C-alpha cells in the first residue's frame, strides 16, 4: 500500500473468504460468528454477507465478511466480491489436494482484478483433525503462506486445538494496527487540532461561577 491509502480513519473492514466448494468456509464463519448451523451439508450458491462489531484500542470497527461460492463456474463472479477487500482469507481442505492447487487459480483471478499489495492474505488449512487423510503436507502449506506473506492457521471447524475465534480476531486487530501505524501524519495533526479546539470550546462554554 502507498501513503495515499491512509488518508482517512479506518471505520470498517471488508473481508472475503475464498476457496473451492466444500472446504468449510461457511462452517468456519458460522463457528466464528456463533451461528448454529455447523453441520449444514449444503454449498454456498451465491454469497453470504455477515457483519460484526469489534473493538480495538477503545475504538469501534465494523467488519463486513463475505462468504463466497466455491464452485469453479463461479470464479469469474468472485471479482465482484473482492473489490475493496482489505483482507482475503484463502481456505483449503487438508484432505483434498485439488483444493490447495485451486488457490493458484484464485490468486491469478485476484491479481487480474486488484492490487495484491493493498490486501492482507490469510491462509487457512481446514479439517486439520483428519491427519490420516491429509493430502497436503503442513510444511508445503506453510511455505505457500510464506511466499504470500500470509498468516497461516490449521483449523478444524469442529474441534480446533487453538481457538479459531482468537486467530480471526487477531487478524482483524493486526490489520487495524498496521493501518493506524501508516495513517497520514497530516491527518493525525488535523485531528489533534480539531480535538483541541473542541476541548477549548467546551471549556469556554462552561458557566462562570
Predicted regions mapped to residue ranges:
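Conserved P-loop small GTPase signature centered on TRAFAC-class small GTPases
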Residues: 1-26, 30-34, 53-60, 114-209
Amino acid at each position: 500500500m502507498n501513503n495515499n491509502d491512509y488518508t482517512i480513519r479506518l471505520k470498517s473492514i471488508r473481508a472475503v473468504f475464498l476457496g473451492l466448494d466444500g472446504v468449510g468456509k461457511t462452517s468456519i464463519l458460522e463457528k466464528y460468528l456463533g451461528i448454529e448451523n455447523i453441520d449444514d451439508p449444503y454449498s454456498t450458491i451465491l454469497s453470504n454477507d455477515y457483519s460484526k462489531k469489534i473493538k480495538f484500542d477503545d475504538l469501534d470497527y465494523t467488519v463486513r465478511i463475505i462468504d463466497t461460492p466455491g464452485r469453479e463456474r463461479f470464479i469469474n463472479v468472485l471479482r465482484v466480491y473482492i473489490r475493496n477487500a482489505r483482507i482475503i482469507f484463502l481456505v483449503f481442505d487438508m484432505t483434498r489436494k485439488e483444493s490447495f492447487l485451486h488457490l493458484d487459480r484464485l490468486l491469478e483471478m485476484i491479481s487480474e482484478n486488484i492490487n495484491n499489495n493493498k490486501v492482507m492474505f490469510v491462509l487457512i488449512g481446514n479439517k486439520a483433525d483428519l491427519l490420516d487423510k491429509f493430502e497436503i503436507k503442513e510444511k508445503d502449506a506453510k511455505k505457500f503462506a510464506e511466499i504470500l506473506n500470509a498468516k497461516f492457521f490449521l483449523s478444524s471447524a469442529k474441534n480446533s486445538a487453538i481457538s479459531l475465534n482468537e486467530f480471526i480476531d487477531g487478524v482483524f486487530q493486526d490489520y487495524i494496527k498496521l493501518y493506524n501505524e501508516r495513517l497520514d501524519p497530516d491527518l493525525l495533526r488535523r485531528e489533534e487540532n480539531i480535538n483541541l479546539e473542541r476541548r477549548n470550546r467546551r471549556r469556554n462554554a462552561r458557566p462562570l461561577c
